[in-house]
Amino acid sequence: MAAISTCQTVIPLPIPVFFNQQFPTLVDICARWQLVFDADAPFELRFESDTLTLHKRDEPKLDGIIVDFVTGAVAHRRKFGGGRGQSIAKAVGLKQGVTPKVVDGTAGLGRDAFVLASLGCTVTMVERHPVVAALLEDGLRRAYQDAEIGDWMRERMQLFHGSSLEALAKLEQEVDVVYLDPMYPHRDKSALVKKEMRVFQTLVGADLDADGLLAPAMALASKRVVVKRPDYAEDLAGVKPSMVIETKKNRFDVYVKSAMK
């Protein structure tokens, strides 16, 4: 069964959030992730319909943000998204007989990690912000319990909470591929991206240390490092990739160390 381990050493703790102090489930979640009640905090955590939800308090019209691996867009992509023909699958080296062990060093809401896990990869998600990690943990909890996907989710997806820079070097496991998708200003104006980017940029801030991820990722991965970038972004750390896989709005920069077998 997949484990959820924690390494809370980088972001100053505790993190202030607003939450209902009379709700035992919320109290337990916040205590576990070192989130403390603050009446003036810009973000609120709620537990609604068995789901942990993040709300930006000064924009009450925005829907709450959740991690959902069971329904919605990710479920549709799992069923109809093109399987191993997808660009992300090609980027990490998925092919017949090859299902890499992947570390997603910038997990976010876990969507790309879920795609890779649904295609057979074993994925460890690394997330350093405790609020985002709490959302991921809640999404995993519900997915692990799901009758359709729970069995393989427990086998293939796990969460490691800690700084990407430090945790990548401390993960004592065999890693074929490190996948990185650092926060980058988006030009996409879709409602979903605008909503999530507003919330995430306020909560997490920019990945100012993103360039520092490449070297430890290259040291950890035995086969390759894959960096997802907007099509207009510069190369991570100014390092030219071995190959580039382009999509409509993004590209995958692939830094190859050895052949996938």
UniProtKB/Swiss-Prot annotation:
Q: Which InterPro entries match?
A: 16SrRNA_methylTrfase_J, SAM-dependent_MTases_sf
Its UniProt entry gives the catalysed reaction(s) as: guanosine(1516) in 16S rRNA + S-adenosyl-L-methionine = N(2)-methylguanosine(1516) in 16S rRNA + S-adenosyl-L-homocysteine + H(+)
What GO molecular function annotations does the UniProt record carry, in alphabetical order?
rRNA (guanine-N2-)-methyltransferase activity
- Note whether Lyase occurs among the keywords: no
Q: What is its main location?
A: cytoplasm
User: What is the protein's given name?
Assistant: Ribosomal RNA small subunit methyltransferase J
Q: Which domain of life is it from?
A: Bacteria
Where is the protein localized? Answer: Cytoplasm
Q: Which residues form a coiled coil?
A: none
Q: Which residues of this UniProt protein bind S-adenosyl-L-methionine? A: R111, D112, E127, R128, S163, S164, D181
- Function of the protein: Specifically methylates the guanosine in position 1516 of 16S rRNA.
User: What Enzyme Commission number does this protein have?
Assistant: 2.1.1.242
**Gene it is expressed from:** rsmJ
**Similarity comment: family membership:** Belongs to the methyltransferase superfamily. RsmJ family.
Q: Which UniProt keywords apply?
A: Cytoplasm, Methyltransferase, rRNA processing, S-adenosyl-L-methionine, Transferase
Q: Which residues cross the membrane?
A: none
> Keyword Glycoprotein, does the record have it?
no
What GO cellular component term, any one, is given?
cytoplasm
At the top of the EC hierarchy, this enzyme's class is transferase
